[in-house]
């Protein structure tokens, strides 16, 4: 699957804006560009888990099976799932529909910032010290650290990580991961995506998160790509407001994950057990992990 990337003409791009990513659409675009069809489903390891590229899977059962192969302590994500009900039907007890929205920014809609960021600089990750700084940020935000030995190599379409550091102290204050879809799975539409944006909760510099998003957008624009996608929790209104300001719009596609202790709050949601004391919560959480239904009769009394 090699060849020159053919980006859509403006009139074709308008049509693409209302079309969801699917396996059939990807194969049609590859055929249209006289490129080889995808030979097998593709996934990219990001150091904390795999991104399973949903539109490279011709079969829902195979996607469900691959999600069930998630390694202990990792977090796999199946993105661009067109028919999530078909995938969930193969493992309803182990998989769940992620309550996040996918947003897309077409680069033709992007407007650069009027002023450059001040007080920090953004650069690529190079050293072991850089990775340690990134993992410190992720752990501070309750996110999984990056296992560098697990990363898909860059020459095989692996991700790229960026670091924002304080201009005065050199201390890392933010990080973000980007994926070039043209390199990752020969995406004929010239897409890219943003993952794992994190800013130090103690950072006093304003605008670090927005600057990292803009940096990634402008980086992929310089690579002649067409759009950037990202995923945001459906009720994160503050983040959504920022993304809308930058030109992102909702995309009709879905994400599926495997149930684990890391994402438990996403598939359980708040319930009456929220008012239980810490010791009762331990028992309830363990019951949920084992798939046991819990009924709270008296939260104050721990019953």
Protein language model features and the residues they cover:
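Conserved beta-strand-loop-alpha-helix junction that forms the acyl-donor binding cleft
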Residues: 56, 79-86, 230-239, 256-261
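Acyl-donor-binding surface of acyltransferase catalytic domains
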Residues: 26-31, 48-119
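Short amphipathic alpha-helix that is part of the acyltransferase structural core
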Residues: 4, 110-146
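A conserved beta-strand-loop-helix scaffold within acyl/acetyltransferase catalytic domains
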Residues: 142-197
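Conserved active-site alpha-helix within GNAT-family acetyltransferase domains
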Residues: 64-66, 83-98, 210, 222, ...
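Conserved acetyl-CoA-binding loop-helix of GNAT-fold acetyltransferases
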Residues: 59-68, 196-199, 205-218, 244-245
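Conserved N-proximal alpha/beta basic substrate-recognition cap immediately N-terminal to
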Residues: 274-303
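C-terminal "cap" of GNAT-fold acetyltransferases
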Residues: 95-114, 233-237, 252-275
